[in-house]
Design a protein with these regions (language model features):
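A hydrophobic/aromatic-rich effector-binding and dimerization subdomain
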Residues: 1-18, 73-138
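Generic protein-terminus/edge-of-domain signal
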Residues: 1-61, 68, 100-104, 111-115
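Residue-level recognition of short, well-ordered coil/turn positions
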Residues: 53, 142-143
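A conserved hydrophobic position in a structured secondary element of the catalytic/binding core
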Residues: 64-65, 87
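A general structural signal marking secondary-structure boundaries and capping sites
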Residues: 66, 138-141
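Short, solvent-exposed positions on alpha-helices
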Residues: 125, 143-151
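Conserved small/polar residues in nucleotide/adenosyl-binding loops
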Residues: 153-155
Length: 155
């Protein structure tokens, strides 16, 4: 991808992180070979995706398609809290059927040049609750934890 660096690697079907930090580093434009979803929780952040700028509001969902050029600009005086999900293209392809296609949200975001979903009541939604359960499942050492994670994805 001419002049842009590839950042991050994904060695599994998906990965989820819940991060809160104060970032003083300026991020350069970059891309990933996997899809990325960021659920913005708090801070003062602008997200840049494929030439568009999005000032984020709490609980915005940022959809970054694989190979999209993007970066984040963070106000270093405030904590930046977010949940990040990396999803491999192979994982999405494995769950594509005639009835549904998990890549639809990424394709629609790209087609409509609108990478942010603004859901004002997200923190009360079942999607947010499942995301939190999925996040916690990665730290669980319970029997069949990976099966539990897959069942959460199927919900």
């Amino acid at each position: 991808m001419g002049g842009y660096n590839k950042r991050g690697y994904l060695n599994s079907d998906f990965k989820i992180f819940h991060l809160t930090d104060q970032i003083s580093t300026e991020f350069k434009f970059h891309y990933h070979e996997f899809h990325k979803i960021t659920i913005f929780i708090s801070g003062n952040v602008q997200y840049f995706v494929e030439g568009k700028t999005y000032p984020l509001e709490p609980y915005d969902i940022v959809l970054v398609n694989r190979n999209d050029i993007h970066r984040v600009q963070v106000d270093p005086s405030l904590p930046y809290e977010r949940i990040i999900v990396y999803i491999s293209p192979g994982f999405i392809d494995a769950y594509r059927t005639d009835d549904y296609d998990l890549s639809y949200c990424f394709e629609k975001a790209k087609k409509e040049h609108s990478n942010v979903l603004r859901i004002h009541s997200l923190e009360k939604s079942s999607l947010f609750k499942i995301t939190n359960r999925l996040e916690r499942s990665f730290s669980d050492t319970e029997y069949a934890g990976s099966l539990y994670r897959l069942s959460l994805i199927h919900i």
